[in-house]
Amino acid sequence: MKKRTKKKLRALLGLLLVPVVLTGCRIRTTPVGVFAQIMEYAGQNNSQASSSHGHGTYHTESQPSSTPMPQMDYDSLDTIGEVQTIMVYLVGSDLESDYGNASLDLDEMEAAGVDTAHNNILVYAGGASEWQDRGLSGDECTVLLLTDTGFVPVDTYPAENMGDPLTLSSFLNYGFDFFPADSYSLILWDHGGGPVLGYGVDENFRDLLTLDELSEALGDSVGAHMTKLEWIGFDACLMSSLEVVSVLAPYANYMIASQETEPGWGWNYDFLSELSDEVIPGDVMGEYIVDSYMDYGEYVFDYYPNLYSDLTLSCIDLNAYAEAEEALNDYFAELDTSLDVQNYPRLVRNRARVRDFGTYSSDMDYGMVDVLHLLELVGNDSEAAQAAAEAVENCIVYSGTNMDNAGGISICYPYQTDADYRDACIEMLYYLGFAPNYTRFLEDFYAIENGDTLLADREISNAETSVTTQNDGAYDESDITL
């Protein structure tokens, strides 16, 4: 793939981060206006150097925060738990300023009856233009600590850019340094846009964290302390993907995240009632989080059927990721070798049938598909595909869903998206170094569709693809013309 200029990459992000809308459920994907403003800002200020592999960088340059967090004085606090410290990075965004969802989740945390004598629930709240409750200000970021009487403010700072990796790493270092415990975990709360778009929207600074920025923040905190987090959870949409897992794997043991969009109410924080005077392993906590999320969703749907939405939440073993990536890389090497204009129609047909995510509640096609369903449909009983599926299944500790063919973890395989989004996906994969044979396969797949030369210099004629759906929703090779 040719080297792209920084200007080109900014343009790609500016185009792809636009067509997302919120539904009546106030889903946690990122809204149109905020992304458009973010990318307008990024286009004016991005000066990030190219990545070392020569394919540029796909992230936005963050506007500097004011300063890293200074040291705190917590002598006035009665107790500090020593069993678990759970840090919540609460980027309020429009979810708070328009709907008060962040304040509602703080209420849920207080109501959970947490054992605060042994556990620290530490919140860094900011990123909203205004707060509906709790006396918080959009001009400030506030550190909150949960006590037996509720949240108390520990420190307050001028508004920090929560889309800057320095802000996240500073908060994590703050938690490590001043709230020591036997186990640490992190919740990332806000909008999510999958691996291409990233996580979080700071309304005040018009910024978000892309995956490379998230990696930077974790490296400068978790990596610097050489203490793995027990788990990282995304109370955000579309973040349960292998690409996200590849970023988190060096820094945590488990990930809890959703393949699909989340309703505006997000997680049910009643799971915090399970905290005790003993460390709860990440896989066990993952089950608590998944079950409480699914149970609450079904409860809401029973009383308010008009709010029904697709639900997914999974607990992923990050220590099993390396074997899964290797197996996937082997399979896509095999698939790419056999890819030509003759078998392309079968791939198109099966890609169109794979369970995808994010399209239910938005006008944007994120290209996120279920990995296991993809391998089932395109694998064609290949031993390599079966080995890859087994390795991926080994990563999925626990999952809950009300959808068919939602196995627990996704991969980004853009299909009926525009070229700009596809280019940004490829750029992201190169930047992360994720499964190189998968990236190569995608480039060859798109080359056939565009009538270009394959990476292996296989010439094909110009091709146009037309897929029609039969009345029963099935696809047939005769439905696909080249």
Give, region by region, the residue ranges found by the protein language model.
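Residue-level signal for short, function-critical loop segments
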Residues: G92-S93, G127, D190-G192, Y415-T417
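N-terminal extension/subdomain marker
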Residues: V34-P180, L482
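Structural recognition of the beta-strand scaffold that forms the well-ordered cores
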Residues: T85-L90, N120-A125, Y184-L188, E230-F234, ...
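Terminal, contiguous helix-loop blocks that mediate binding/assembly
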Residues: E40-T79, G194-P195, Y199-L482
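Catalytic-core segments of thiol-dependent peptidases
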Residues: A125-M226, A236-C237, L242-E243, Q259-E260
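Bacterial N-terminal signal peptides that target proteins for export
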Residues: K2-L13
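Bacterial N-terminal signal peptides
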Residues: G14-V21
